[in-house]
Amino acid sequence: MAKYVTIMDIARELGISKSTVSRALSGDTGNVKAETLQKILATAELMGYHRNELAVNFRQQSTHNIGIIIPEIVTTFYMTFINEAQAILRKQGYKVMIAISNENPEQERENILMMEQLRVDGILMSACDKEHNVDLYNKVIERGIPIVFFDRTVEKVKASQVHMDDYIMSFFMVEALLRKGYKHIIHIPGPAYIRNSYERLRGYRDALEKFHIEYQAQDVLSPALSAEEGSWVMERFLEKNVPFDAVFGFTETAVLGAKSAIQKRGLRIPEDVALCCMSGTALASLVHPQLTVVEQPIEKMAQESCRLLLEHIADGYRRIEEIALRGETVIREST
């Protein structure tokens, strides 16, 4: 096993006090002679000394580490968010630790407790379930670790939250389809345990109501997140031979799966069936036909989430904010 070089080892090598070596290596050099300082620094480098950052941070009550907990990596949204947030936090002197919950509330719970044990200064989090771990969220916050929720937010938690206005953006998307003349729009929702799913479904229903089209429960298919799930759900629906002329999906990956199933049936997009979805990314412009999407303001979401978390780390929860961002509707070939 490798032996870690300690301050005591350097002091013993040079025959000087441990406190002198400690001051020199911590930057407190006011009372250390220049000649002694040079010897200490040279010896430390020669012996392979590395400062124990964990011990230093423990004494300073700060690790300068931020935890980011995400529910999945099926969609490209979270990787884009992490890249943006990490760049922002690094500029402020923070390192980022990432944990994935795999849509499992118990695994999410373990991730939160792990972050707490590692003494992160704060957590950016997208919840995998809107209710399951609310008790733990509140306890961790009460114990002094601020949490800012992004994208998948939760209720009954005294924490700042940043998300897209899912209701209004889904309403606008379905309204755009209806204005184009589509009459029978089916919806591939997200799982019920995600708060965004309810908001997007609500926008879909209210847009239909505005155009005096009766909401039909059978037009809301089984939930899907991945392309595989989207394909499976669409295949099951197509087997029923129910007429429809458009698909509105919870997320891009599920709609790409649905697109594959539709094209395998020989249906043309958009001549026979129009496709659109929420949570669009750059991927939507790389497929043929290109997808009509609502693009989430990921960069802005990361900026606001980081800003709020850094404010909470600096001064506690003086002001809790909920920020609902507008996305951008991008009309492409699929509609």
Residue ranges and their predicted role:
Residues 1-2, 6, 57, 61-175, ...:
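Alpha-helical recognition/docking segments in bacterial nutrient-uptake
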Residues 1-63:
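N-terminal helix-turn-helix DNA-binding module of bacterial transcription factors
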Residues 44, 89, 207-208, 238, ...:
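Conserved hydrophobic residues forming the short capping helix/wall of the S-adenosyl-L-methionine
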Residues 71-80, 98-107, 129, 152, ...:
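Hinge/beta->alpha junction and helix N-cap segments in small-molecule ligand-binding domains
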Residues 91-92, 143, 208-215, 239-243, ...:
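Short helix-capping segments at alpha-helix termini
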Residues 184, 215-219, 268-274:
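Short acidic capping loops at alpha-helix termini that bridge into adjacent secondary structure
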Residues 235-335:
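Flexible loop/turn connectors
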